[in-house]
């Protein structure tokens, strides 16, 4: 199972780094920061499906 450590999030600003992650909501997040901010917003219900685009 792929996991991402989001303990340092949320962050107010994310870099434009392009390292896509696919969330359990079938959305592609451009990088870990954007994904982790979404995880925090979802109260932990969003999980990582896999690395790369959905």
From Swiss-Prot:
For this UniProt record, the keywords arranged alphabetically read as follows:
Disulfide bond, Glycoprotein, Protease inhibitor, Repeat, Secreted, Serine protease inhibitor
Glycosylated residue positions:
43
InterPro entries assigned to the protein according to its UniProt record, in alphabetical order: Bifunctional_prot_inhibitor (IPR051597), Kazal_dom (IPR002350), Kazal_dom_sf (IPR036058)
Cited CDD domains: KAZAL_FS
- Assigned GO CC terms: extracellular region
* Listed GO MF terms: serine-type endopeptidase inhibitor activity
Disulfide pattern: 6-36, 14-33, 22-54
Q: What is this protein called?
A: Ovomucoid
Q: In this chain's numbering, which residues are marked as the site (Reactive bond 3)?
A: 16-17
Q: Domain Kazal-like, which positions?
A: 4-54
Q: Cite the domain annotation text.
A: Avian ovomucoid consists of three homologous, tandem Kazal family inhibitory domains.
Q: What is the lineage of its organism?
A: Eukaryota, Metazoa, Chordata, Craniata, Vertebrata
Taxonomically, the superkingdom here is Eukaryota
Q: Where in the cell is it found?
A: Secreted
The yes or no answer to whether the keyword Glycoprotein is present is: yes
